[in-house]
Amino acid sequence: EGLADLRDRVLPEVAEIRARHEGQASAIVAHGGVVRVVLADVLDLPDAAFFRLDQPYGALSVVDWSDGVPVVRVAGAVLYSPA
């Protein structure tokens, strides 16, 4: 799947989740590519920057949409000690 196809599949689903849970905290558990798509979108990054977003396995990223404008609070945080 190419980046454009991934973006076209992911962003409408994220918008639907946000609409369904408006005003509530929500969690999306996904692989790194999906997380990169969301982060790149909210940061208005070009496709060339996609792989410059580090998203390790099991990492946490947090986007706050509370005022309708996305703010990245955490990106790619690893909260465990890798073996």
Question: What are the residue ranges of the model-derived segments?
Answer:
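Internal catalytic-core helix/loop-beta-alpha segment
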Residues: 1-21
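Acidic, low-complexity terminal tails and accessory targeting/binding regions
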Residues: 4, 19-24, 41-83
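Amphipathic alpha-helical core segments of compact helical bundles
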Residues: 11, 15, 39-44
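Generic beta-sheet signal
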Residues: 17, 24-33
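Glycine-rich phosphate-binding loops at beta-strand->alpha-helix junctions
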Residues: 34-38
